[in-house]
Every structure is written in structure tokens, then in C-alpha cells.
């Protein structure tokens, strides 16, 4: 191939929602209200959302704005920690793990933004800066210093930092170990018959990897049928048939 992608969940900059709205029109999705919904959801302004983020370059005339926040905060870990809610903490970690798995199954090189490996949340200290440009720039909410005080916790089994870091290390090992993660592998999607579920398949030689990603907040069933073959869950080692999972 003539190129290799660098893939990331978050970086130093804002999220602009650069979606193909010409294509999305066929599904009745209009740009301005859809972006508003996304920005409201990821600020925790929608019922059921535990996300925490802030707007950047909000333009009320164009009804357009960009979003800022760390992966962990946008996935609900900050709110769960504030509430000291273990169930919500577990759900937030599951979201982070799912998104990282989606990152690692892509062709290319996964890039981890500093702090994401330990679930670092938003840093609001920029609002107290003596520098006007800094305190008026919400992008600094996800540009905080690395939390070295939390780094040792990644090696303590059961901590939030350990659960996130260990899962990422496992994904890294799998990406190096199995041929289907190679950049030359064939990649395609399978129909799941559920708009909240995405099934990505990768194949190289006689080896194949299938990833099923649930973007909802509840258990769903992917109505896929991969025949009578026995598959192994690369995370748990469990063996099963991939049919209605």
C-alpha cells in the first residue's frame, strides 16, 4: 500500500464532527441539529449522558461549535468518579475499552494521547491561568499535565488506571501477535441488523479476526452468522460459534 494511517481517539485539538452530511441527508440527518445534539450529549446535557466536555469556537449564528474533553471524561469516567458510582465507573471503562479496541482493529498505527492510558479526566485549571489566551481556550481542558501521581496505580490490580492500562496492553499484544492485524490484511464489515452495532472483519491467509462494537448503552444482539466454525475470544479465551452474539 502507498500509505499508512495514524489513528487516534483524542489528540491535542478539538473535535469538529467532520461528518459527510451530504450522505447523511438520506437518513434525515441535518448538519446543524445533529452537531448540536452531539455537543449537548458529550457535555452531559442530554438525559442519560454522563459525558463531560466543553465547547470551543461556539458560533450561535451558524449554530456550529467544536467539542473538547479527554477520552475518559467524554466516556463518563469523570462523572462516575464524582458520584463515586462503581456501576457507572465500570460502564465508563467498558466504553473506553470498546473505543480502544475499535482503534486497534483499524489498519494503521494506533496513537495514544498522553493520559488516555491511565484514564486521565478533564483538567479545569486552565480557567485560572493568568494568561488570557490560555484561560479563554477550552482546548486546554484536555491538555493538562500528565498525572504522574496516578501512574503507579496502573500496576495495582483493580484500580481504574490498571483496568484501562491492562486492557490497552492486551490489545497491543494481540495486534502484534495475529496476522489479520497486518496492514496488508483484507478488511470489511458484516451486517449486524442493528444500527448501534458495528462488525469489522480482518483476514490474512487462513487467519481471521472479527470485532463487534456496541455503541449503545445496553446489551444488544448482532445477528451475524459466521457458519459452524468455532471462534476464540482473544480477550477471555472462550470458544464459541459466531451466530447471534
Features from the language model and the residues they span:
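Active-site and adjacent substrate-binding regions of carbohydrate-active enzymes
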Residues: 1-245
Amino acid at each position: 500500500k502507498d500509505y499508512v494511517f495514524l489513528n487516534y481517539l483524542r489528540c491535542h485539538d478539538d473535535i469538529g464532527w467532520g461528518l459527510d452530511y451530504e450522505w447523511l441527508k438520506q437518513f434525515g440527518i441535518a448538519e446543524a441539529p445533529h452537531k448540536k445534539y452531539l455537543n449537548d450529549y458529550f457535555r452531559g446535557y442530554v438525559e442519560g449522558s454522563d459525558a463531560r466536555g466543553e465547547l470551543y469556537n461556539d458560533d450561535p449564528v451558524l449554530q456550529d461549535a467544536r467539542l473538547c474533553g479527554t477520552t475518559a471524561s467524554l466516556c463518563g469516567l469523570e462523572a462516575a468518579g464524582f458520584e463515586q458510582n462503581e456501576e457507572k465507573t465500570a460502564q465508563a471503562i467498558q466504553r473506553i475499552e470498546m473505543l480502544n479496541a475499535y482503534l486497534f482493529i483499524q489498519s494503521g498505527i494506533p496513537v495514544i494521547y498522553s493520559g488516555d492510558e491511565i484514564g486521565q479526566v478533564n483538567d479545569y485549571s486552565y480557567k485560572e491561568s493568568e494568561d488570557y489566551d490560555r484561560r479563554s481556550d477550552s482546548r486546554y481542558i484536555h491538555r493538562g499535565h500528565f498525572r504522574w501521581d496516578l501512574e503507579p496505580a496502573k500496576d495495582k490490580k483493580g484500580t481504574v488506571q490498571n483496568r484501562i492500562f491492562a486492557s490497552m496492553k492486551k490489545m497491543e499484544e494481540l495486534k502484534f501477535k495475529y496476522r489479520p492485524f497486518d496492514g496488508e490484511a483484507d478488511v470489511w464489515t458484516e451486517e449486524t441488523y442493528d444500527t448501534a452495532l458495528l462488525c469489522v472483519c480482518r483476514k490474512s491467509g487462513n487467519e481471521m479476526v472479527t470485532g463487534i462494537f456496541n455503541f449503545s448503552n445496553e446489551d444488544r444482539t448482532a445477528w451475524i452468522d459466521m457458519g459452524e466454525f468455532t471462534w476464540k475470544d482473544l480477550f477471555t479465551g472462550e470458544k464459541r460459534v459466531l451466530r447471534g452474539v
